């Protein structure tokens, strides 16, 4: 198997497939009400809704970087504001997450394999840019990390 299909496999597993670590993100999100999504059971912590918007923003930023865009915070911000907390707004947030995921997978599928080992347009730190492969593995790790946070918040909101 080439690297592109492996990366797509990892993206799909963490999003809605069968990841090694447990439940995928979309399964964790299923059954969460808009009230649960907006709740902040941990003082100074993020809500499920904020985490969903953050994951979406970084999927979009990753896709921007794949197209050669300069690295930076996502266009919508690192932690986009939630806005209104209605049931339709929550459904829309989850749908935007799904769309961002599909667009990212499509962009990865269209990526020429040799580009994976080229540096991204990211010279913010020590002058050594990560490769596109490192960027893509990083977004999988990012999403798994935040999916775990969402799972804990979901459990906490179900216990009250």
Residue ranges of predicted features:
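Short, contiguous alpha-helical
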Residues: 2-22, 26-29, 34-81, 121-160
């Amino acid at each position: 198997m080439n690297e592109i299909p492996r990366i797509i496999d990892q993206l799909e597993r963490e999003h809605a497939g069968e990841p090694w670590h447990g439940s995928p993100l979309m399964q964790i999100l299923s059954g969460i009400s808009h009230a649960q999504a907006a709740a902040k059971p941990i003082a100074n912590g993020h809500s499920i809704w904020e985490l969903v918007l953050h994951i979406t923003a970084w999927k979009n930023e990753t896709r921007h970087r794949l197209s050669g865009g300069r690295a930076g915070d996502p266009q919508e911000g690192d932690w986009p504001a939630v806005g209104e907390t209605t049931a339709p707004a929550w459904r829309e947030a989850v749908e935007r997450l799904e769309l961002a995921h599909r667009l990212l997978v499509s962009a990865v599928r269209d990526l020429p394999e040799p580009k994976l080992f080229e540096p991204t347009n990211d010279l913010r730190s020590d002058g050594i840019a990560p490769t596109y492969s490192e960027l893509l593995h990083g977004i999988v790790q990012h999403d798994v990390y935040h999916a775990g946070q969402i799972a804990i918040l979901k459990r906490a909101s179900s216990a009250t």
